[in-house]
């Protein structure tokens, strides 16, 4: 008796088990979030329904910038290979959206064929029509970098109303569609001719819900001198501050991202360090992909909940028979008050609400009589998903991350800076003398010996107290000096001989020059007398 009650209760008690995070997200979306979206026509207002490919696709990087800022050259620099459909020049060359992806052979897949392929995450782009699809293609080629990530090249953004209208499709809406699904958005600026056009400002504003994905690259920085570069950097930060309304400062990478010689090499070290940081950021994307998809699903669920409250509130206010049109106009005009009412009644943050102006525009064309009343069961299901299922998936995300290397992207420009003499920081700081036959500390040892013999050595060694008197003269914090002591006391006897003292002074010099100390003493820094005993 009442077997259906016990069955339902059992289903609630027993959490669903998933093999992977992607599978879990796919099932949760289809079973718990999609019914809410469909019931309140979410897809007509915000974003098309997600498909299997959206949960399984590789991390994607979206490049956005004005024409001739080096977007296509940047991709060429990363993968170290020309790709089909690539055009580079000072004039606006890239006139299409090009998805650069891995494939067994080189070739181009046109947009109309791409949007019918269920294995690709682009099927919902058919909503933008032929004008867009004729300007969309996939360049596929066998390349080790593309094994781990895909890159989206975009048309250069131009200034002027004529350019915006002549595209034939809503450029900002297409970018917003991609922004929802990519893992990283890179905005490129040309340091030599810094300018943010009106259309570029609109595009950046369209990406405002995805600030966590945005990184900025100030490209072609080798074309200007240090003093000018400082001014350009300041001007860029000031301009971005007016467009991106967040209290946090967006991360800006400065460099020259191509394989040609630097025109003005003054800032070579800065460019190398910045390039290394950007590469590390891109290399972390495969490891963080599952977390990004989880985060995006949570954002989508919160928006879907708010949307359900908005639509059901409008339905509740509509008359049954007369005066529907006049009431509709009144409700659209007073949508801000409805937002405030929902915010108060359901304790929802104002940041979860969609853009008021955009929502008002979309509601003008809708038939309010087809809207649905509030259905608490659908909302309860989504709340349960956010409270319980997502927490379980979070544990799986951490497990999957721990099994992946921190730098998963290999090949192309990423291999050039990994190891060897041209790796970042090779032969500098604690790495100085790594390839020398002689002990690198030896050249300064006579100077250090003079100090050593003034510190009252006993049996050729000085105590920690005597060493401390000399080491604190460097004015380095005790935490740093403590680490240097541990590294220099190679035989761990609590005393320093002349070689160990010289090593301690060498490490102090390394730190004072602005380099980091190694976690363990590199083999080339071990004093010669200690090597024989190993």
Swiss-Prot record:
Modified residues (N-acetylmethionine): 1
Region G3 motif, residue ranges: 153-156
Keyword Acetylation among UniProt keywords: yes
Keywords of the record: Acetylation, ATP-binding, Calcium, Cell membrane, Cell projection, Cilium, Cilium biogenesis/degradation, Coiled coil, Cytoplasmic vesicle, Endosome, Membrane, Metal-binding, Nucleotide-binding, Phosphoprotein, Protein transport, Transport
Annotated segments matching region G1 motif: 65-72
Tissue distribution of the protein: Highly expressed in testis. Also expressed in kidney, heart, intestine, and brain.
Binding-site residues for Ca(2+), renumbered to this chain: 489, 491, 493, 500
Domain EF-hand: 476-511
G5 motif: annotated segments: 243
Source organism (scientific name): Mus musculus
Descriptive protein name: EH domain-containing protein 1
């Amino acid at each position: 008796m009442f077997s259906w009650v016990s069955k339902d209760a059992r289903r609630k008690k027993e959490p669903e088990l998933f093999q992977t995070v992607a599978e879990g997200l796919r099932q949760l979306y289809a079973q718990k979030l999609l019914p809410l979206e469909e019931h309140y026509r979410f897809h007509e207002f915000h974003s098309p329904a997600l498909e299997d490919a959206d949960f399984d696709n590789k991390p994607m990087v979206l490049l956005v910038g004005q024409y001739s800022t080096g977007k296509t050259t940047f991709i060429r620099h990363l993968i170290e290979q020309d790709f089909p459909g690539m055009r580079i020049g000072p004039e606006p060359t890239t006139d299409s959206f090009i998805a650069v992806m891995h494939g067994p052979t080189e070739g181009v897949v046109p947009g109309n064929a791409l949007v019918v392929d269920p294995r690709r995450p682009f099927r919902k782009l058919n909503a933008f029509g032929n004008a867009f699809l004729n300007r969309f293609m996939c360049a596929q080629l066998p390349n080790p970098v593309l094994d781990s990530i895909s890159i989206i090249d975009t048309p250069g953004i131009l200034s002027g109303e004529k350019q915006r209208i002549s595209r034939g499709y809503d450029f900002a809406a297409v970018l917003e569609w991609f922004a929802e699904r990519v893992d990283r958005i890179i905005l490129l600026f040309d340091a030599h001719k810094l300018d943010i056009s009106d259309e570029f400002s609109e595009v950046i504003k369209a990406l405002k819900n995805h600030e966590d994905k945005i990184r900025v690259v100030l490209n072609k920085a080798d074309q200007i001198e240090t003093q000018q570069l400082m001014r350009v950097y300041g001007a860029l930060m000031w301009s971005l501050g007016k467009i991106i309304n967040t209290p946090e400062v967006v991360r800006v990478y400065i460099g020259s991202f191509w394989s040609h010689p630097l025109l003005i090499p003054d800032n070579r070290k800065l460019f190398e360090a910045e390039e290394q940081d950007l590469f590390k950021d891109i290399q972390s994307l495969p490891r963080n992909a599952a977390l990004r998809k989880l985060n995006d699903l949570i954002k989508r669920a919160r928006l879907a909940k708010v949307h359900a409250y908005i639509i059901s509130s409008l339905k509740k206010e509509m008359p049954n028979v007369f005066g529907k049109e006049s009431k509709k106009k009144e409700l659209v005009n007073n949508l801000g008050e409805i937002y405030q009412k929902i915010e108060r009644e359901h304790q929802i943050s104002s940041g979860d609400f969609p853009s008021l102006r955009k929502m008002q525009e979309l509601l003008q064309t809708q038939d309010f009589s087809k809207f649905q009343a509030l259905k608490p069961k659908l909302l309860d299901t989504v709340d349960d998903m956010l409270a319980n299922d997502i927490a379980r998936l979070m544990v799986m995300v951490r497990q999957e991350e721990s099994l992946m290397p921190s730098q998963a992207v290999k090949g192309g420009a990423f291999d050039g800076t990994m190891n060897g003499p041209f790796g970042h920081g090779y032969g500098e700081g604690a790495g100085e003398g790594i390839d020398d036959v002689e002990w690198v500390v030896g050249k300064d040892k006579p100077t250090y010996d003079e100090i050593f013999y003034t510190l009252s050595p006993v049996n050729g060694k000085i105590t920690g107290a005597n060493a401390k008197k000399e080491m604190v003269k460097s004015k380095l914090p005790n935490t740093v000096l403590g680490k240097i002591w541990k590294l220099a006391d190679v035989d761990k006897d609590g005393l320093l001989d002349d070689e160990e003292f010289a090593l301690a002074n060498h490490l102090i010099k390394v730190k004072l020059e602005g380099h980091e100390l190694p976690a363990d003493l590199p083999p080339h820094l071990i004093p010669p007398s200690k090597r024989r005993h190993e």
